[in-house]
Amino acid sequence: MTNFQIYPAVDLKDGNCVRLVHGKEKNMTIYEDDPIKQIQFFLNNGFKWVHIVDLNAAFGKSNNKKVILKILKSFKDKIKIQLGGGIRSVEDIRYWIDSGVSRIVLGTFAFNNPDLINNLSDYFSKKLALGLDLSLIHI
């Protein structure tokens, strides 16, 4: 049997836990207004990791930095956080790792800077992952 881990996702938009349909903001449903409560639910149900996406940052419209920092403080040493969305610089990567994020998921930044990513992978070791969003035949 192959071992695998499920990472429940928390997509943050304006501090709320949301779900987008086909990645469109206009097709958004808020399913929890307290991300701490949502992550506590995942922790109570045995999950070891949570995947958080900052949709505000991903869409280039502010960010959920304060909310994410509160999550990191609330769950330090309890659950690992994997973070993606709007991370577009080495400074962003360093900031979030230094703040306690266990793994950074890079998307567009990685594709636009492949040589830099090769160097970063040496520096940050197992702290980076590559995220691909596919739509029909487009990445």
Where are these regions (language model features)?
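Glycine-rich beta-strand-to-loop/alpha-helix junction loops that act as flexible
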Residues: 53-55, 82-87, 106-108
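Conserved small/polar residues in nucleotide/adenosyl-binding loops
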Residues: 137-139
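Structural preference for beta-strand elements that scaffold enzyme active sites
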Residues: 5-9, 49, 78-82, 103-105, ...
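Glycine-rich, proline-tolerant flexible connector loops at the mouths of alpha/beta enzymes
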Residues: 49-67
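Glycine-rich phosphate-binding active-site loops on the catalytic face of alpha/beta enzymes
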Residues: 99-116
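Alpha-helix-loop-beta-strand connector modules within alpha/beta enzyme cores
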Residues: 61-82, 119-132
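Catalytic cores of alpha/beta
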Residues: 81-100
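Conserved, mostly hydrophobic/aromatic
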Residues: 11, 42, 50, 96, ...
